[in-house]
């Protein structure tokens, strides 16, 4: 078994390849490393010269033309925002800044400041023009970020490259919370994957997205605040067991796991509208 680790997009990527010569495996890993770093230069909120930072700085002044790939991601975000009734919203960035989740200077803001910040949150403030891939922000202070979907998008691009290279079996993991199992190791029915509750599942040609706040939170005056904010209220979502979503598309699994953590009542809508996904909020028996 070959395995490779590298950092990109603020997380650790891991690639497992069960077959092939070491030189070939290293070449495959190099292709994926290059791709994730290319995406980081496009999507990062923390690189001042990224495409996203340029968009955030200028799109409220005039329409900005973006690459078709980025425009496709924005269209996906728009669709998921509608599907989840606003629980998934990449314009949440002003709220993330307000609570200190961007600069790591954590604080609990007052209700009036939260209400004011909410005026700059909402995908309806991001106007998309497909003819030319133009993007315009309706208000100054609107900011996009892809923390709830970017890892899934990156994993999806990695899987695309693996298939182009003819790789029959691989596991691509982004941060332990978003992964895709391509094929299966020789002699196995799938890739054995451990869930946060300690149980294991077998995945084959499937993606997994997991969301929870057990690892990222802060406390103020004895009150615990998780890092997953509800873009509809401006406050952290109530702490609850992790949510796992299994499906064909790692992008969907990444985004929907976050949305369902924020609003569990959306589960029936997701099951109806996205027949290729399986959802568990209890984390037991998923995919067995």
Predicted features, each with a name:
Residues 1-288:
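Mature catalytic core of soluble alpha/beta enzymes
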């Amino acid at each position: 078994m070959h395995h490779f680790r590298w950092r990109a997009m603020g997380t650790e990527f891991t690639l497992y390849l069960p077959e092939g010569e070491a030189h070939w495996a290293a070449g495959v890993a190099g292709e994926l490393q290059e791709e994730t770093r290319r995406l980081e230069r496009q999507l990062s909120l923390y690189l001042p010269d990224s495409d996203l930072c340029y968009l955030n700085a200028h799109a409220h002044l005039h329409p900005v033309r973006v690459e078709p790939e980025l425009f496709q991601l924005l269209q996906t975000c728009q669709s998921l925002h509608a599907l989840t009734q606003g629980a998934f919203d990449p314009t949440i960035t002003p709220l993330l800044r307000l609570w200190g989740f961007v600069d790591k200077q954590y604080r609990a803001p007052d209700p009036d400041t939260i209400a004011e910040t909410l005026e700059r949150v909402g995908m309806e403030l991001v106007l998309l023009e497909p003819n030319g891939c133009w993007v315009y922000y309706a208000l100054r202070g609107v900011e996009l970020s892809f923390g709830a979907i970017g890892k899934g998008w990156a994993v999806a691009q990695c899987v695309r490259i693996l298939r182009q290279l003819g790789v029959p079996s691989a596991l691509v993991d982004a941060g332990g919370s978003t992964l895709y199992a391509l094929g299966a190791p020789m002699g196995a029915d799938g890739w054995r994957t451990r869930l946060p509750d300690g149980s294991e599942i077998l995945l084959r040609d499937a993606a997994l997205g997991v969301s929870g706040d057990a690892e990222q939170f802060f406390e103020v005056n004895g009150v615990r605040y998780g890092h997953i904010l509800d873009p509809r209220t401006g406050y952290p979502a109530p702490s609850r067991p992790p949510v796992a979503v299994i499906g064909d598309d790692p992008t969907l699994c990444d985004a929907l796991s976050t949305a369902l953590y924020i609003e569990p009542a959306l589960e029936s809508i997701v099951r109806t509208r996205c027949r290729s996904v399986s959802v568990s909020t209890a984390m037991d028996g998923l995919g067995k």
